[in-house]
Every structure is written in C-alpha cells, then in structure tokens.
Regions:
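Hydrophobic, aromatic-enriched alpha-helical segments typical of multi-pass transmembrane helices
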Residues: 2-236
C-alpha cells in the first residue's frame, strides 16, 4: 500500500464519526419537534397525578414518546460523534463531554418514560412503583439537565462556530431553558407548562445546525486531505 493510500484511508476513518453529526442532529430535530407536537395533553383539572393519568392513557402517548426517544437517541449519538472530532478548544471539549453524558442518561430516562403508560392505573391509585419513581426522577432532574445541556451546547457551539453560529445559538438557548424549566416544575405546578411549545425551538435549532454542518464537513474534508495527500505523494 502506498503512502498516499494509507493517508487517505486514515483521513477517511478519522472523518467517519463527524460525518454523521449533521444528519443525526437534523433527524433528531425533526423527531423532537414531531414528538412534541403530538404529545397528549390533559384537561387541567384535578391533581397532578390525575392529569398525568390522562396523558398516560391517551392514544398518542406511545407515538409521541417513541418519536421523542428517537430524538434523544439521535442527539446522544450525534454529540458522542462530535466529541470524537479533533480541534475542539478546552472549553468546547469540556461542554461536549458533560453534555454527552447527560444525553446518554436522558435517552435511558426517556425509554423508561415511554413505558410509564404500562403503570397508568397504579400511578392513578397512588402506588409508588419503580416506574413512578423513575418517571419522577426523570422529569424533575434528568430532563431539566438535558435542557440545560442543549442550551450550553448551543451557546458554546455557536460562539466557537463549531455547532451553528452566534445567530443559531439563540434557538438552542431559549428552547433548552424553556424545556428545562417546564420539565423541572411539571410535577408541582401548571404555571410553566406553557413553555413546552417554546421548547420546540430545540428541534428547529438541531435541524438548522445539522443542515449547516453537511456542506461544512464536505469542504473541510477536501481542504484537509489535499495538502496531506500532496505531501504524502511527494515523500513517496
């Protein structure tokens, strides 16, 4: 195998994880927006437990949360792949590392949340089952952290222009903060429930920055490989 072939192979392997970031963010954004749009609601009457029961037995519970689970998985995979790219500054690398951990935990939490409907009657009856406890922790701790993580990633990525730019960061920041506050308080009050539609900005942010990263990767891949290949062929 010639030196130029080895260099080309190494560059191709190095670029594989980064190539999926844009498509996964865009797909995650679409499914997040769609899942939120069809999320079942409640009547607003009765206790928070009875309102939760209304949503759990709603016909759109599984379709909505299957889409949200797919979105969480896409986001987590995209962030993990982005973490593997080189050239990230210390601050951006730290943010990406922390958010990647949160994203994985949130994906697991959303999986449990998806199947909370299986325990709808027990929850309505006041039983403190494992699913109920897991759902409570997921809603009040994991989901808010995920929202804050997305907001932080949008800001850090926008300022460094590694994920989006200073304009797109506003979408992720507002959407992430809205999702975080609404999720953290949903078990206790309806006051911030109106913020959930605003959280759909996360989906819009992900689609926009995901599409922005598609041509960028193609340009950076070509620009980076050409000099290396020229040097390799010369030395060979």
């Amino acid at each position: 195998m010639s030196t130029s072939t080895r260099v080309r192979t190494q560059l191709s392997r190095a670029g594989r994880p980064e190539r999926v970031v844009g498509p996964l963010l865009a797909l995650g954004g679409v499914t997040f927006f769609a899942g939120g749009a069809i999320h079942p609601g409640d009547s607003g009457r009765g206790s928070k437990v009875s309102q939760l029961h209304e949503m759990l037995v709603g016909s759109m519970w599984y379709p909505s949360h299957a889409l949200l689970l797919a979105a969480m998985a896409c986001f987590a995979t995209a962030i993990l792949a982005f973490r593997r790219r080189g050239g990230l500054g210390t601050g951006m690398a730290t943010v990406t590392g922390a958010v990647s951990v949160i994203a994985v935990v949130a994906t697991i939490g959303m999986t449990l949340h998806l199947f909370a409907a299986l325990d709808a009657d027990g929850i309505a009856g006041g039983e403190k089952t494992f699913i109920y406890q897991a759902q409570t922790w997921n809603e009040t701790i994991v989901d808010p952290l995920w929202g804050l993580g997305i907001a932080a990633l949008a800001v850090a990525g926008g300022l460094t222009r590694t994920i989006g730019n200073p304009i797109t960061l506003a979408l992720g920041l507002v959407g992430g903060l809205a999702y975080s506050l609404a999720s953290a308080t949903i078990a206790f009050t309806d006051r911030f429930d109106a913020l959930f539609p605003l959280a759909s900005l996360i989906g819009i942010w992900a689609v926009v920055v995901g599409l922005m990263m598609l041509p960028r990767k193609a340009r950076s891949g070509g620009a980076a490989s050409a000099p290396d290949l020229d040097r390799a062929e010369t030395s060979n």
